[in-house]
């Protein structure tokens, strides 16, 4: 009787060793992976939008510096990006334009083309010249998150008219 019991016990242990996961175990693993993916995906998409904004911020900064150089040589601000010869990104996410008000300021805009889908915000930069002190000042502004695609308008150094000052 004892040998029969040993045989049944060993055969039962062998079956368990050869068996795979139960359906419940597999479902629990799938649910855990789904929850982790649901948490990580929005964070990942937010990082992609931030990377695209970083490219626009760099271009606006380059346009601000180019405006300073152009003004130093010509005595006036440039009216378009082609004159400044700053290589702009390919234009899939932002449209870059220069809006010159007068000989004391130049506003450069980076308008988000598809801000809702891309997770990007419009930006603008301002280059200001003070003829009294003969000094330049610059600012880079970013629109609020979830706002429309219109770039903020800088009102002077460190003034973005209610939008976020990022430089």
Regions found by a protein language model. Give the residues of each.
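N-terminal leader/signal peptides at the extreme start of proteins
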Residues: 1-21
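Conserved hydrophobic/amphipathic alpha-helical signal-anchor segments
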Residues: 2, 14, 46-92
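N-terminal single-pass transmembrane signal-anchor helix
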Residues: 15-47
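Hydrophobic alpha-helical segments
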Residues: 17, 31-34, 53, 107, ...
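Periplasmic/extracellular, small/polar-rich flexible segments of pilin-like filament-forming proteins
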Residues: 72-167
